[in-house]
């Protein structure tokens, strides 16, 4: 089954394709002529995922899905949350985001955090929302080279390595 995934992020595309396996072929918006940046203007992960999926579906008429993920840190009242990609700057500057997160957690004992992802899937014109949560903690320095974003700082519960140290299969 071919489905449009609302991302032009090569890392994310690779990760999701590996999870979905051979039964699905992910294609990018560009492959369907959607070259502009897809808007993310909502104040919730659910709102952003839904907005992106509907934007693609309205322009292509094809089955599609979109996600929005936020890192929610307990000691920061759930921040950066929906603003994770633009935590430190208006752009997607992962290094700046990680530096700001570490600065904001200096001297803070409670490092509990979670990644929360919301997926909006539109099949046959009908939308379904899904949510996934990974609980964990933030360490005090970046470790690992895989993944992207906050992955070098996040250790999921039950592991002693960051997401950036794990393989896609893990």
Which residues does each predicted region cover?
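Anionic-ligand binding patches
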Residues: 2-4, 10-170
């Amino acid at each position: 089954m071919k489905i449009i995934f609302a991302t032009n992020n090569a890392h994310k595309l690779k990760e999701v394709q590996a999870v979905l396996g051979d039964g699905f072929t992910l294609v990018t918006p560009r492959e369907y002529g959607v070259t502009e940046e897809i808007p993310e203007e909502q104040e919730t992960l659910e709102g952003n995922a839904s907005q992106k999926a509907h934007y693609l579906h309205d322009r292509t008429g094809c089955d599609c899905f979109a996600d929005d993920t936020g890192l929610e840190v307990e000691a920061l009242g759930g921040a950066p949350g929906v603003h994770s990609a633009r935590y430190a700057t208006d752009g997607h500057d992962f290094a700046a985001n990680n530096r700001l997160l570490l600065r904001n957690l200096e001297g803070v004992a409670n490092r509990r955090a979670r990644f929360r992802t919301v997926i909006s899937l539109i099949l046959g014109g009908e939308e379904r929302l899904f949510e996934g949560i990974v609980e964990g903690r933030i360490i005090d320095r970046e470790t690992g080279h895989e993944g992207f974003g906050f992955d070098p700082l996040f250790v999921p519960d039950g592991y002693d390595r960051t997401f950036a140290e794990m393989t896609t299969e893990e």
